């Protein structure tokens, strides 16, 4: 039953983080599946759940335009190697040295980046490539798709006011997806949709060994390090928090090994970087 509950929560999150990262909903879904199978098998704690996250989406959205999907795949592969080495050399214990205000500012910044990046989707504005500030400056003169905005607003309200006691049995995010999908179909609303989800676990867009070369690895070193640092930070902080709540401390270094193995393989399935997160 716990597995079904987690899957119900993870499905809408995987789709949402796939889109908000600048990739596709399919990439988010594939990441959740592969990460769930591989990372959980080697994890340092039974309560850790891995998949695409909001924090990683905030980084990827700035990388996808510059390096493309293949660049993301290679950076993820490199980050997986770095995470694996970090676990082997027992660097997981360094997480306790990070100041609390740094983490607070980090998570707040992620929330702002994700929210600002989804403004144009919220208003149903297509083909706008400017920055968030450009969008806010000219939004009055842009064509706003009101059905998209209304659906987005109702979804937010449902997520805010949905009773927490109900959420343990049926997640608000999953209910929002079901209701909005039914509304679009029943009313025949012309709004942008996620699109076709591949029926195969390995889509056409995925990393191939022949595409990995030294020059690309040099170019993508900094993005790979960024993914690695974020992977270490979020995964171990989530594990520390859940460990205190369950009185079962996590093996930090084993968790890094698991994250490393998972992110080495995920790009070959067409997925994006996976981290650990807490589902409550």
Segments predicted by a language model, with ranges:
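Transmembrane helical cores of multi-pass ion-transport proteins
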Residues: 1-278
């Amino acid at each position: 039953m716990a597995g079904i509950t987690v899957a119900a929560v993870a499905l809408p999150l995987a789709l949402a983080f796939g889109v908000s990262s600048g990739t596709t909903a399919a990439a988010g879904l594939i990441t959740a599946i592969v990460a769930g199978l591989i990372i959980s098998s080697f994890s340092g704690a039974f309560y850790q759940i891995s998949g695409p996250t909001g924090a990683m989406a905030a980084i990827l959205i700035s990388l996808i335009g510059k390096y493309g999907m293949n660049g993301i795949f290679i950076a993820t592969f490199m980050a997986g190697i770095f995470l694996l080495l970090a676990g082997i050399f027992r660097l997981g214990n360094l997480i306790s040295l990070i100041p609390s205000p740094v983490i607070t500012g980090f998570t707040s910044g992620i929330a702002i980046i994700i929210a600002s990046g989804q403004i144009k989707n919220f208003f149903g504005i297509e083909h706008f490539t400017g920055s968030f500030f450009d969008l806010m400056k000219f939004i009055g003169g842009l064509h706003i798709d009101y059905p998209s905005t209304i659906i987005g607003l109702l979804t937010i309200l449902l997520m805010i006011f949905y009773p927490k006691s109900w959420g343990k049995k049926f997640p608000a995010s999953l209910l929002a997806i079901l209701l909005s999908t039914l509304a679009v179909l029943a009313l025949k609303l012309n709004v942008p949709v996620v699109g076709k989800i591949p029926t195969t676990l390995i889509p056409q867009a995925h990393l191939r060994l022949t595409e990995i070369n030294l020059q690309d690895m040099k170019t993508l070193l900094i993005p790979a390090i960024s993914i690695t640092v974020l992977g270490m930070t979020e995964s171990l902080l989530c594990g520390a928090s859940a460990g205190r709540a369950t009185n079962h401390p996590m093996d930090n270094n084993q968790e890094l090994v698991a994250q490393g193995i998972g992110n080495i393989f995920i790009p070959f399935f067409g997925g994006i970087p996976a981290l650990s997160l807490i589902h409550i």
